[in-house]
Amino acid sequence: MTTLTNQKPLGVLFMAYGGPENLGEMPGYLADIRAGRVTSQAILDEITNNYRLIGGKSPLPEFTRAQVEATMEQLASTGRPLKAYIGMRHWSPWIEDAVREMLDDGIEQAIAIVLAPQYSSLSVAKYQKKIKAALEMNHGHIDFAYIDNYHTEPGYITALADRVRIGIQEFPEDERDDVHVILSAHSLPVRIIKEGDPYADQLHETARLVAAQAGLTDEQWSWSYQSAGRSPEPWLGPQLDEHLRDLNEQGIKKVVSIAIGFVSDHVEILFDIDIAAQEVAHELGMTLVRPPALNTDPLFIGTLASVIERKAAEVA
């Protein structure tokens, strides 16, 4: 790795969505996601039950901590003192608290990265706005360098392509030519496309690179969104359950499902794919395989370290 000569500590703020670490935190967590809007008892009960079915908590905070620890280990040889901070958008440890801690520690320069490879005004930009608001609230200044996206990084693409192969290999060798791969990501409102948001384009670029590296033909894979919100406005589709039904009508019975927009296990994988999508597949007589999420995969951790190191060199 490049040796950086500036010895002033450089902060590295890792940001993720956040998630409840027990069922008792669900009301507050949902209230934050819904910006204080009242959550009906029916919705609260439904989502609480979803979390109960995946173990009674979100594994995202734990995986985020592990990802940060592994990334910082790789960055230890950069030559410049680095200090990691974790901030969540919708639950503790809050982004605002992380920024306050950075100010208290005397951090003057920092890198901010969201654990989401594709940029959107409704995702990554929201995290960055929280940083700026926290600085204003605390009347402080930190020179932040933002990593907006890393959706085409070779290590990230290779790690996902490896998961395609892992999923296909779950099927008997004589059936693998019949396996169809679904690549998916969290849906967002359709209006972002009209506003020129790059989210969908970046997802499709990632998907094409993954499919090519995995050696898939155009007929062997397709794209789907998942986990659409509950607002009445149109959301990007098709949704995963609808897509499974469409594939079934085409005679496809063996499927590998990989959520390329998520970098760790959480409810949108463990419930939306492992439970909800599996129920649809079972109903249709399909076999659905979901390979492991990236979590602390060395290739993905190497990707995070690489993009952070490059950004650190820019601000040195």
UniProtKB/Swiss-Prot annotation:
The keyword Cytoplasm applies. Fe cation binds at residues 186, 268. It is an enzyme of class 4 (lyase). The lineage of its organism: Bacteria, Thermotogati, Deinococcota, Deinococci, Deinococcales. One of its GO terms (biological process) is heme biosynthetic process. Keywords: Cytoplasm, Heme biosynthesis, Iron, Lyase, Metal-binding, Porphyrin biosynthesis. Catalyzes the ferrous insertion into protoporphyrin IX. This is Ferrochelatase. GO terms for molecular function: ferrochelatase activity; metal ion binding. Gene3D superfamilies: 3.40.50.1400. It is found in: Cytoplasm. InterPro entries: Ferrochelatase, Ferrochelatase_AS, Ferrochelatase_C, Ferrochelatase_N. Its main location: cytoplasm. It comes from the Bacteria. It catalyses: heme b + 2 H(+) = protoporphyrin IX + Fe(2+).
